[in-house]
């Protein structure tokens, strides 16, 4: 556990930073998503080397899954429905959570985002439809909810 503590702090700090940054600006910059991705792979290399292949597949699945959604929507509607920062952030979360947790993480993030959007509609009315809803904060919250499996695999 003591070896994993710096990684836990790193993960929590960068996920919190990304969630807040995306909520304020609508952006998930590479300077935050890339270190989070490499940190997840390094965590598995040092603390759980037997899970490193699952972490690599998690990063690939996270990136590939959201990239398909991004490009499919963009080609169909000629505009972005999902930012490319979200694609890279899910790749980073995949590196931390491994591929098995990603479906639950994405489902939770989508449900949280729907709930947040519903609250925004109730509070602001139709003006909530004008600005796009950042998805990064919901990915961050879902990552924290499912994160117990990453840092406490035996518990």
From Swiss-Prot:
One of its GO terms (cellular component) is membrane. InterPro entries: Peptidase_A24A_bac, Prepilin_IV_endopep_pep, Prepilin_peptidase/N-MTase. Pfam families: Peptidase_A24 (PF01478). Transmembrane segments: none annotated. One of its GO terms (molecular function) is aspartic-type endopeptidase activity. Belongs to the peptidase A24 family. This is Leader peptidase HopD.
């Amino acid at each position: 556990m003591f070896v994993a503590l710096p990684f836990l702090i790193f993960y929590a700090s960068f996920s919190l930073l990304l969630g807040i940054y995306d909520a304020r600006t609508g952006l998930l910059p590479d300077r935050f998503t890339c270190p989070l991705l490499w940190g997840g792979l390094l965590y598995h290399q040092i603390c759980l080397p037997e899970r490193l292949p699952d972490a690599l597949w998690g990063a690939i699945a996270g990136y590939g899954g959201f990239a398909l959604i991004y490009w499919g929507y963009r080609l169909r509607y000629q505009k972005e429905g999902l930012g490319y920062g979200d694609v890279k952030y899910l790749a980073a979360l995949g590196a931390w959570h491994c591929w098995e947790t990603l479906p639950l993480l994405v489902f939770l993030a989508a449900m949280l985002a729907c709930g947040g959007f519903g609250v925004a509609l109730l509070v602001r009315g139709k003006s909530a439809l004008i600005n796009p809803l950042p998805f990064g904060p919901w990915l961050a919250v879902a990552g924290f909810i499912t994160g117990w499996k990453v840092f406490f695999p035996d518990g």
